[in-house]
Amino acid sequence: MNRVQACWVFLMALGCGSDKAEEHTASETDAVAVDWDCDPIAPTRCGLPFPSTYFMTPSEDTVTGFQVALGETTIPANIDGKMTSPRFLNEKDGFSPLTPLITHFEYATAEGLVSHTDISRYLDADAKTLLIDVATGERVPHFAEVDASTDADYARILMIHPVVPLAHGGRYVVGIQGVVDGDGATVETSEAFLELRDGKTSADPRVETR
């Protein structure tokens, strides 16, 4: 039986919020420096998984009750090595309902993923990717692929593409299971996710505060 390798939650935007987003800040009692700009669920790529409520903060000033709160180093640097400011994204109260859902597992392949040529497989009991509407509990039709724009096997991003519009203000859960590498071995799951999945105590405050 496949065990879940990754799972995260995200919220679709209803409209523009204020510009009062609060960022995660490390406690004065933290024993080590914590990079709150990055989600430890996907430690190999800062900013992933995306979109995610990890990169949001509660807000009384928005329709959704949340506001995007990307850190100054969350967005990857451009080709010139310059960071992109998240200022304008942080004015939003959720993420675009048209965005693909992306994460990263080193050496992940497309083997067994729901293909764009057979989308009906998203309903299979052993589907490797799940996209669930929290309000209805129903699966959302989608297909998945790995980024083919690079020859570096370890660097390819896993992308999930909904094939129907997601609801404004909707809340969704993504689940991933049984993704394999080029040798057919299950790709490694992050320690942070294993701690969350199995209910274990973590030394990482980014896990403990979830």
Across the structure, where does each feature detected by a protein language model lie?
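Sec-dependent bacterial lipoprotein signal peptides
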Residues: 1-14
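General secretory precursor processing signal
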Residues: 10-11, 19-20, 41, 49
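Ser/Thr-rich, Pro/Gly/Ala-heavy low-complexity intrinsically disordered linkers and tails
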Residues: 13-31
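Acidic, low-complexity Ser/Thr/Gly/Pro-rich repeat segments typical of extracellular/periplasmic
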Residues: 26-210
